[in-house]
From Swiss-Prot:
Keyword annotations: Amino-acid biosynthesis, Metal-binding, Methionine biosynthesis, Methyltransferase, Repeat, Transferase, Zinc
Cofactor: Zn(2+)
Enzyme class: transferase
Catalytic activity as recorded in UniProt: 5-methyltetrahydropteroyltri-L-glutamate + L-homocysteine = tetrahydropteroyltri-L-glutamate + L-methionine
Source species of the chain: Aliivibrio fischeri (strain MJ11)
Record-given protein name: 5-methyltetrahydropteroyltriglutamate--homocysteine methyltransferase
Residues binding 5-methyltetrahydropteroyltri-L-glutamate: R23, E24, L25, K26, K123, R530, C531, W576, E620
C-alpha cells in the first residue's frame, strides 16, 4: 500500500492553446487584418484569453501557470521580435504588432496587396503547427526590443499567479532559422557563428526576468531530441555557462528522447530537465540514473499531442519508483505544449457518453497532471481516482466494434505487387499525352477555391438539419458550376471542382469513412489565425460508398476540359488526425490506403482521367531522429502507392506537397511514382527545386509560382521570372504552372487576379518557347 509522501510533486504544463475555446483569437486577428477593429480591441481579446487560461491552470491545482506561451502568430516569430531580429525589408525601427504581422503575412491590415514578401514558413518539427523561419545574415544584431514576454509575466503576477515563463532557447532559435544570403554562405558564414551575439541578448532577457522576481524559467531546447551535428551539440555547454543567472532554468525537451545527448546535458549550467516520456518512454530510466542530484526532473507524462485520456493508473505504476528515487525533485507535466490539443472537451455535447470517456482535451489534461501528481504523493483518494479514470480505456481494449475482421483480412492480403502501377512512368506518360492533349506549361490549381460565407452557412445549415439534402446538393452544385465557369473564363487547362462541399481536406474524408470520430470544437492552431479540426481515429477504417465521385462527375459534365479528382492521401489523413494509440501508425496508413484505392477505381470508372492524391504532410510525419526515418518512409511510400496503383496507365496521378524540405526525402518522393507532383516553392524563390534538379527527378513537376498564404497579388512579371527560374532546373516539357497550395482561405477577387496573371505568364512563355523551338 502506498503511503502519503512528505514531498510534494510539483506540477506544470509546457504551454496552453492560445486560440480560445471558441477561436476568439482567430476571429479577432482576422477582423484586425481587415481593418474592422482597432489594435486595442485585438489586444483586449488576447488579454482576456490569457487571463482565462491562467485561471484554468490555477483552478486545476497546478503549482505554476505558464506565461510567454501566448503568440499573435507563432512563438518563434514572437521570439524574433523579442530579440529585435526582424528582416530588413520589414524593419522600420522599433518593432510593433504590425511589424510582426508583416513578417508573417507580408502585410498587416488590408492594403494595396503589394507588401513585402513574408518570411518563409515551415512545420514545427513533426507536427501540423507552423512557424515563421528566422532569417540570418552575418551582420545581424540582437537586442531586447519587444516587451510582450515581460508584460505578460507582469499581467499574470498581477492576477496573483505563481508564474513560470517559457522561452525558446538560443540554440534552438538559431537552428530553426536559415541563412538567407547565398554569397555569405559561399564565403563560409554559418548562423551558429551568431551565437555569442545572441547570448548577449539572452543575458539581458534573464536580467529583466530576475527583476520581475521570476524563480524558474522553462527554456525550450527541442533540438536536443535531434541527432545534432557535433558543432551544435558542443555549443550548448558554453551557451548555458554564459546565460546562467540567479533565475533557475528548466531545460525543456520534447517530441523524442534525449538520452543520446545525456552526457552533454548533465554538464549544463541548468537546474532541471524536462523530458517527453509520452513520445519516448524508454529514456526515463537512463535519465533518472544520470540526473545530477541537485536537479529537478520534469516528466512529461500527459500527452500534449493527442486527445486520448491519459492512462493514469499505468502512469502511476510506472512513475512510482521514480517518485521514490527523486522525492521532491520529481515534477509532473504535459509532454509538450498543449497547443497541439483542442481546448475543452466539455463543449462536445454531441459525443456519446462512451466516446467522451475516451478523450481529454487541454483543459482536462490540466487535471490529469495534478491528479497523477497527487497519486504519486500517496493520496489514496487520488490513487483510486486514477484507477477509475483509466477504466473506460480498459473497456475499450476489448470492444468488438473497434477491431473489424473484414479490415483485418484486407490488411493481411497486402503484397508488394498491390503497390505497383501496371507500367513504368515513361510508358504511362505517352498514354497520358495522347489521352489528355495538354499544352506546354499546363496550368491548374491545387484543388480548393474560396470558401465564401454562403458556402459555410449552407454547409452548417445542412449539418444542423436546417437545410434538407436535396437543397444542399443543389446549393453545392451551384458553387461547383460557378467555380468551373470562373476557371473556363480564366482559361486554365486542367480544372478542379473547388471543394465547396468540403469543410477541410482531411475532416471531409474522416466524416465519410467509418472508424473516425469528428468533433464540433476540436480546433487546434496550424499557423497565424488558421485553425484545423482534426478528426480522431477510433476504430478500423472502412468505406461504405464512393465519397467524391458524384461531385467530380458533375463538375466534369460542365466542361470539355479535364477535371481533376481530388483525394487526400493516406499519410496526410493520418498525419492530420489524432491517431489511435493501440495500433501502429503504419497499420492506420494501410487501412486508409485501401479505402482510397477503392475511391481511385471508382473515379476512374466514372470517366475522370486525372486524380490528385494530396500528400502535403508526408515530410512532417518523419521521426525527428534521422536514424528512425527510413522505416517511416518505407511504409509511407507504400501506403501512397497502394492508394494509386489501381489507376490505369492513361490515368494521370498527381500529388501535392507543401512546406517541405525535399533534400533528405527526395528518393522517397520519387519512389511515390506520381505522374505529376506539385510543390510549394514561391516563398523560397524556387530553392526547393534544387533537390529535384540534383536528383534528376524523372516525372512531371509543378512548382508553385505564387504564395497563397499571403494576400499579396503576384504580377505577371513576377510569375514569369519564377517559371523561368524553374525551367532552368526542370525540363520545360515536364513543367506545370500552379499556385503553391489550395485557395480556400483567399477571396475570389484576389484569387482571380492572381490566377489571371498566372495564366497570362504561362501563355507568354508558352508562345516564346514554342517559337524558339520552331
Amino acid at each position: 500500500m502506498t503511503t502519503e509522501s512528505k514531498t510534494k510533486t510539483v506540477t506544470h504544463i509546457l504551454g496552453y492553446p492560445r486560440v480560445g475555446a471558441q477561436r476568439e483569437l482567430k476571429f479577432a486577428q482576422e477582423k484586425y487584418w481587415r481593418g474592422e477593429i482597432e489594435q486595442k480591441e485585438l489586444l483586449a481579446v488576447g488579454s482576456e484569453l490569457r487571463q482565462r487560461h491562467w485561471k484554468d491552470q490555477s483552478a486545476s491545482g497546478l503549482d505554476f501557470v505558464t506565461a510567454g506561451d501566448f503568440a499573435w502568430y507563432d512563438h518563434v516569430l514572437t521570439t524574433s521580435l523579442l530579440l529585435g531580429h526582424v528582416p530588413a525589408r520589414h524593419n522600420n525601427g522599433f518593432p510593433d504588432l504590425d511589424t510582426l504581422f508583416k513578417v508573417g503575412r507580408g502585410q498587416s491590415q488590408n492594403s494595396c496587396g503589394c507588401g513585402e514578401a513574408a518570411s518563409d514558413m515551415t512545420k514545427w518539427f513533426n507536427t501540423n503547427y507552423h512557424y515563421i523561419v528566422p532569417e540570418f545574415s552575418k551582420n545581424d544584431k540582437f537586442n531586447v526590443s519587444w516587451s510582450q514576454l515581460f508584460d505578460e509575466i507582469a499581467e499574470a503576477q498581477k492576477q496573483g499567479h505563481n508564474v513560470k515563463p517559457v522561452l525558446l532557447g538560443p540554440l534552438s532559435y538559431l537552428w530553426l532559422g536559415k541563412e538567407v544570403n547565398d554569397e555569405e554562405v559561399e564565403q563560409g558564414f554559418d548562423r551558429l557563428s551568431l551565437l555569442p551575439r545572441l547570448l548577449t541578448a539572452y543575458q539581458a532577457i534573464f536580467s529583466k526576468l530576475s527583476a520581475l522576481g521570476v524563480e524558474w524559467v522553462q527554456i525550450d531546447e527541442p533540438i536536443l531530441a535531434l541527432e545534432l551535428p557535433k558543432a551544435w551539440a558542443d555549443s550548448f555547454k558554453l551557451a548555458y555557462q554564459v546565460i546562467q543567472s540567479d533565475v533557475k532554468l528548466l531545460l525543456t525537451t520534447y517530441f523524442d528522447g534525449v538520452e543520446h545527448h545525456l552526457d552533454k546535458i548533465t554538464k549544463l549550467a541548468v537546474n532541471g530537465l524536462h523530458i517527453d516520456v509520452s513520445a519516448a518512454p524508454d529514456q526515463l530510466d537512463a535519465i533518472v540514473s544520470a540526473l545530477p542530484k541537485e536537479w529537478v526532473l520534469s516528466v512529461g507524462a500527459v500527452n500534449g499531442r493527442n486527445v486520448w485520456r491519459a492512462d493514469l493508473e499505468r502512469l502511476h505504476e510506472r512513475l512510482q519508483p521514480v517518485k521514490e528515487a527523486l522525492g521532491d525533485k520529481l515534477w509532473i507535466a504535459s509532454s509538450c505544449s498543449l497547443l497541439h490539443s483542442p481546448v475543452d472537451l466539455e463543449q462536445e455535447t454531441e459525443l456519446s457518453k462512451e466516446t467522451l470517456q475516451w478523450f481529454a482535451f487541454a483543459k482536462q489534461k490540466l487535471r490529469e497532471v495534478t491528479l497523477l501528481a497527487d497519486a504519486l504523493d500517496g493520496n489514496q483518494n487520488a490513487i483510486l481516482a486514477c484507477h477509475q479514470y483509466s477504466q473506460p480505456l480498459r473497456e475499450r481494449e476489448s470492444a468488438e466494434h473497434i477491431n473489424k475482421p473484414a479490415v483485418q483480412q484486407r490488411l493481411a492480403a497486402i503484397t508488394p505487387a498491390l503497390a505497383e502501377r501496371a507500367e513504368a512512368y515513361s510508358v504511362r506518360a505517352q498514354h497520358q499525352a495522347e489521352k489528355l492533349g495538354l499544352p506546354l506549361l499546363p496550368t491548374t490549381t491545387i484543388g480548393s477555391f474560396p470558401q465564401t460565407s454562403d458556402i459555410r452557412q449552407q454547409r452548417s445549415a445542412y449539418r444542423t438539419g436546417k437545410l434538407n439534402e436535396q437543397d444542399y446538393v443543389t446549393a453545392m452544385k451551384g458553387h461547383i458550376a460557378d467555380a468551373v465557369e470562373r476557371q473556363e473564363r480564366l482559361d486554365l487547362d486542367v480544372l478542379v471542382h473547388g471543394e465547396a462541399e468540403r469543410n477541410d481536406m482531411v475532416e471531409y474524408f474522416a466524416e465519410n469513412l467509418n472508424g473516425f470520430q469528428a468533433t464540433r470544437f476540436g480546433w487546434v492552431q496550424s499557423y497565424g489565425s488558421r485553425c484545423v479540426k482534426p478528426a480522431i481515429v477510433v476504430a478500423d477504417i472502412e468505406r461504405e460508398a464512393p465519397i467524391t465521385v458524384s461531385w467530380t462527375q458533375y463538375a466534369q459534365s460542365l466542361t470539355t476540359k479535364q477535371m481533376k479528382g481530388m483525394l487526400t492521401g493516406p499519410v496526410t489523413i493520418l498525419g492530420w488526425t489524432f491517431p489511435r494509440e493501440d495500433i501502429t501508425r503504419k497499420e492506420i496508413a494501410q487501412q486508409l490506403a485501401l479505402v482510397l484505392r477503392d475511391e481511385v477505381s471508382d473515379l476512374q470508372q466514372a470517366g475522370i482521367n486525372i486524380i490528385q492524391i494530396d500528400e502535403p504532410a508526408i515530410r512532417e510525419g518523419l521521426p525527428i531522429k534521422k536514424s528512425d526515418q527510413k522505416a517511416y518512409l518505407d511504409w509511407a511510400v507504400e501506403a501512397f502507392k497502394i492508394s494509386a496503383a489501381s489507376a490505369k496507365s492513361e490515368t494521370q496521378i498527381h500529388t501535392h506537397m507543401c512546406y517541405s524540405e525535399f533534400n533528405e526525402i527526395i528518393e522517397s518522393v520519387a519512389a511515390l511514382d506520381a505522374d505529376v507532383i506539385t510543390i510549394e516553392t514561391s516563398r523560397s524563390n524556387m530553392e526547393l527545386l534544387k533537390a529535384f534538379e540534383d536528383f534528376n527527378y524523372p516525372n512531371e513537376i509543378g512548382p508553385g509560382v505564387y504564395d497563397i498564404h499571403s494576400p499579396n497579388i503576384p504580377s505577371q512579371e513576377w510569375i514569369v521570372d519564377l517559371i523561368e527560374t524553374a525551367a532552368a532546373r526542370v525540363p520545360v516539357e515536364r513543367l506545370w504552372v500552379n499556385p503553391d497550395c489550395g485557395l480556400k482561405t483567399r477571396n475570389w477577387k484576389e484569387t482571380e487576379a492572381a490566377l489571371e496573371n498566372m495564366v497570362k505568364a504561362a501563355k507568354a512563355l508558352r508562345k516564346k518557347w514554342q517559337s524558339n523551338a520552331a
